[in-house]
A protein has these predicted regions:
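Short beta-strand-to-loop capping motifs
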Residues: 82-88, 170-176, 222-226, 265-272
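Extracytoplasmic/luminal low-complexity segments enriched in Pro/Gly and acidic/polar residues
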Residues: 200-346
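Sec/Tat-exported extracytoplasmic proteins
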Residues: 61, 104-108, 194, 239-243, ...
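Terminal targeting segments of Actinobacterial cell-envelope proteins
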Residues: 1-9
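Extracytoplasmic low-complexity, Pro/Thr/Ser/Ala/Gly-rich segments
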Residues: 30-103, 143-155, 234-246, 333-346
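Long, acidic/polar, low-complexity amphipathic helices and coiled-coil-like
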Residues: 77-84, 90-215
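Hydrophobic membrane-insertion alpha-helices, especially the h-region
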Residues: 10-29
Length: 346
C-alpha cells in the first residue's frame, strides 16, 4: 500500500513540476512579448468628414459597390486615414451621422471657406493621370459644389475617396483616356458667383476654376471662367503618350471675368522629339478658347531655369498678330511661330 501511494505521489509531483514549467514559460513569453497599443477610436468631431464622405458617396445611384476610404484631420492637424469599408465593422461609427452632405459641407466651409480643391486621378497606359479642380476664392464658399463635383462623378469606377478640410480626392481605377462621362464644364452651381456678403457685388471677385491634367512629363492646366467648356480629345492625345524623358511640355490657359485672357505654352529645352508640336498646341488652343475671345497667347521655349525664346500671340476679331519680346528675339523659333500662326488662322 505504501508503495502504491509512493508511486502516485511521484506521478503527481512530476505533473506539478511540468505544470510549473509550463506556467513559467507562458509567463515569460507574455512578459517579454510587446503589449500591443490599443488604437484609439477617432474623435467624433474629427471623423465626421470621413463618415459623411462615405455616406454621401455610397448613396449615389450609380454606385453598385461601396468600397470607399476617407481621411480626416485630427486635433494635431495630421492627416489620418480611416478605413470605412463595410467589411471592417465601421458601420456603427458611420451610423452616428445624419444629414451627411450638409454637415460635411458645413465642416469644410468652417475650416477653409476660401478654397476647395477636388483632385481626380487615374491611369493612362500605365502612366498616372491627375485632374485637379480648384474652386473658389476668399469671398465665396464653394464646399457643396466641390463635394458634388467629386463624389457624384465617381460612379462605379471610383476606388477610394480621401477627404480633409481643404481637399476632396477621388481615386479612379485605370482608364484608357479621360472618362467620357466627366463633364469638364464648370458646374452650374458656380455659373453665377455668390455674393460675398456685406453688400459686395459678386463681380468684384474673380472666380477661377482650375483643371490640371498631367501624365509623365506632360501636363495641361486650364483656368476656366464660368460656363467655359473644353474638349477632351486633344488633351487625351497629348497625355496618352509613352514619352518618359526628362523633358516635358506644359500648357496653361487663364480665364477671367470676360473669358479666357491668356494661354501659355511652355516647353522644356532639350530633346526636340518630346516637345509639343504645332498641331498639338493649336489643337489645345482650339479646345479651350475661340479666337475671338482670346486676348493674348504666349509661347515660351527654353530650359527649366530660364526661357530661351518667347512669342506672344494676340487675337482680336479673328486677327492673330505676333508680338515678340526684344530680349528673346534672337532665340525665337520662327518656324514654330509661323506654324502656330498659320494653324490658328486656318
Amino acid at each position: 500500500m505504501f508503495t502504491r501511494v509512493s508511486v502516485w505521489a511521484r506521478i503527481l509531483l512530476v505533473l506539478l513540476v511540468v505544470a510549473a514549467l509550463v506556467l513559467v514559460v507562458c509567463a515569460r513569453h507574455l512578459w517579454l512579448a510587446p503589449f500591443p497599443k490599443p488604437r484609439p477610436d477617432p474623435p467624433q468631431e474629427d471623423v465626421a468628414l470621413a463618415q459623411a464622405a462615405r455616406d454621401y458617396f455610397c448613396a449615389q445611384e450609380a454606385v453598385t459597390t461601396c468600397d470607399a476610404q476617407a481621411g480626416y484631420w485630427n486635433n494635431t492637424g495630421i492627416m489620418t486615414t480611416v478605413d470605412l469599408r463595410a467589411e471592417t465593422g465601421a458601420e456603427e461609427v458611420i451610423a452616428l451621422l445624419t444629414g451627411a452632405e450638409q454637415e460635411l459641407a458645413d465642416e469644410i466651409a468652417a475650416a477653409a471657406a476660401s478654397n476647395v480643391t477636388v483632385a481626380l486621378s487615374w491611369k493612362v497606359g500605365g502612366l498616372p493621370l491627375r485632374m485637379e479642380n480648384q474652386l473658389g476664392d476668399n469671398k465665396h464658399e464653394l464646399a457643396r459644389p466641390a463635394l458634388t463635383l467629386a463624389l457624384t462623378r465617381a460612379g462605379t469606377s471610383a476606388r477610394s475617396v480621401t477627404l480633409d478640410r481643404k481637399h476632396v480626392e477621388v481615386d479612379y481605377e485605370k482608364h484608357d483616356t479621360v472618362p467620357e462621362d466627366l463633364d469638364l464644364q464648370m458646374p452650374e452651381d458656380l455659373q453665377v458667383p455668390q455674393s460675398g456678403g456685406s453688400g459686395e457685388s459678386s463681380g468684384e471677385a474673380t472666380l477661377y476654376y482650375k483643371q490640371t491634367f498631367s501624365s509623365g512629363k506632360r501636363s495641361v492646366e486650364l483656368y476656366l471662367e464660368p460656363g467655359q467648356a473644353i474638349e477632351t480629345t486633344p488633351i487625351n492625345a497629348l497625355l496618352a503618350t509613352e514619352e518618359r524623358s526628362k523633358y516635358g511640355s506644359t500648357l496653361q490657359a487663364y480665364g477671367g471675368e470676360s473669358g479666357l485672357t491668356r494661354i501659355s505654352v511652355c516647353e522644356l529645352d532639350g530633346d526636340q522629339d518630346h516637345r509639343l508640336t504645332s498641331d498639338e498646341t493649336t489643337g489645345l488652343i482650339r479646345a479651350v478658347a475661340d479666337c475671338n475671345g482670346l486676348s493674348a497667347l504666349e509661347l515660351a521655349t527654353g530650359s527649366v531655369a530660364s526661357r530661351t525664346s518667347v512669342a506672344a500671340y494676340v487675337c482680336t476679331d479673328s486677327t492673330l498678330a505676333v508680338d515678340r519680346e526684344a530680349d528673346y528675339d534672337q532665340d525665337l523659333d520662327p518656324v514654330l511661330a509661323q506654324e502656330l500662326l498659320d494653324a490658328a488662322r486656318a
